[in-house]
């Protein structure tokens, strides 16, 4: 009986932390193929490389948790990056001629404000116009990317040192971009576990009608969800601009929404809504980072990497739906 109980506890432990087991197995597999994968320098490169996508994943997580989706995050990141970069150009040839070079904080807040406005629009369309989140955010995705190309046909570059610090700077041995991701994760975890808003998002995602009966303002909750989502996307865009010292209307944030959705889904945020573990989201981000980094180190081309990511998204959603069907 003791043996069976121990086996049951072990099975529960693996089941509850299966995503971390997958991460460890993946790391071991890639390390066997390329021993340079598990080195301190590559670990730092992986973390800094995935930090922006991580921040954006924290936003998408709430949208999925509310039984929605946000396809606009990559384009919102690009629009915010371009606007914030334009405010903080140190070059003599500016995108907006005659505009003085602004302090870094003005550029950062300006870029984030753009994201908040788009997030409000997304939330309003989903909550009050009753548009499906897929349609609403697909529309804003196209609009934001088009606005990027209307604002500037080419990259906005040569940014001020203060602005670049957010993406490239360090505080002691720690990269600023990683610190920002950790802070955003702490905010997400606190929000979901300790605040009324977080509990409302769980309730709306689980059953919006029951949430309404329980006195939750479903519309206000959804608007806040999409504002948070675009806030994270805009912050990600600002980080991208600071890290690369430029913002490109065609390439900045391109397809980042796919990685964010994949990471959130792989991390256990259910596409059916109402289910999310913040620790699982971190594991999902790391898994996607390991795949991205590992594929490069193994010499796999970009198209094959996209195929693998697509299969991961399909597999994760299929597994999630099957698991929920069994529970019902």
Each language-model region and where it sits:
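Single transmembrane alpha-helix segments in multi-pass membrane proteins
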Residues: 25-91, 124-131, 268-278, 311, ...
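Cytosolic-side transmembrane-helix boundaries in multi-pass membrane proteins
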Residues: 1-26, 32, 213-220, 293-328
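Helix-loop-helix "hairpin" substructures at the membrane interface of multi-pass membrane proteins
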Residues: 103-110, 117-122, 173-248
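Transmembrane alpha-helical segments in multi-pass inner-membrane proteins
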Residues: 233, 244, 248-310
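Transmembrane helix-bundle core of multi-pass membrane transporters
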Residues: 105, 129, 133-194, 221-224, ...
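Inter-helical junctions in multi-pass inner-membrane proteins, predominant
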Residues: 35-49, 148-149, 158, 192-193, ...
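Membrane-interfacial amphipathic/re-entrant helices at transmembrane-helix boundaries
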Residues: 2-57, 92-106, 216, 224
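Alpha-helical transmembrane segments within multi-pass membrane transporters and channels
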Residues: 92-141, 283
């Amino acid at each position: 009986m003791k043996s069976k109980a121990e086996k049951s506890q072990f099975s529960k432990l693996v089941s509850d932390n299966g995503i971390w087991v997958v991460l460890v197995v993946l790391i071991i597999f890639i390390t066997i193929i390329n021993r340079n994968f598990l080195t301190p320098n590559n670990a730092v490169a992986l973390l800094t490389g995935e930090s922006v996508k991580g921040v954006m994943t924290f936003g998408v997580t709430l949208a999925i948790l509310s039984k929605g989706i946000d396809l606009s995050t990559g384009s919102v990141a690009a629009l915010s990056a371009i606007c914030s970069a334009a405010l903080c150009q140190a070059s003599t040839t500016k995108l907006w001629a005659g505009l003085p070079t602004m302090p870094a904080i003005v550029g950062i807040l300006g870029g984030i404000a753009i994201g908040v406005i788009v997030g409000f629009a997304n939330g309003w369309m989903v909550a009050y116009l009753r548009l499906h989140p897929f349609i609403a955010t697909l529309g804003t995705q196209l609009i934001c990317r088009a606005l990027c190309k209307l604002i500037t046909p080419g990259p906005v570059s040569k940014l001020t040192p203060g602005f670049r610090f957010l993406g490239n700077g360090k505080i002691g041995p720690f990269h600023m971009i990683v610190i920002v991701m950790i802070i955003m994760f702490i905010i997400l975890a606190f929000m979901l576990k300790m605040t009324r808003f977080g509990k409302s998002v769980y309730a709306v995602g689980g059953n919006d009608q029951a949430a309404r009966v329980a006195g939750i303002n479903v519309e206000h909750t959804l608007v806040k969800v999409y504002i948070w989502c675009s806030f994270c996307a805009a912050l990600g865009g600002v980080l991208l601009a600071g890290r690369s010292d430029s913002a490109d209307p065609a390439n900045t944030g391109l397809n980042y929404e796919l990685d964010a959705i994949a990471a959130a889904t792989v991390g256990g945020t259910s596409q059916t809504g109402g289910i999310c573990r913040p620790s699982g989201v971190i594991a999902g981000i790391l898994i996607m980072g390991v795949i991205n980094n590992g594929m490069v180190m193994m010499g796999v081309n970009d198209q094959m990497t996209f195929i693998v990511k697509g299969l991961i998204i399909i597999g994760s959603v299929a597994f999630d739906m099957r698991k929920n069907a069994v529970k019902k």
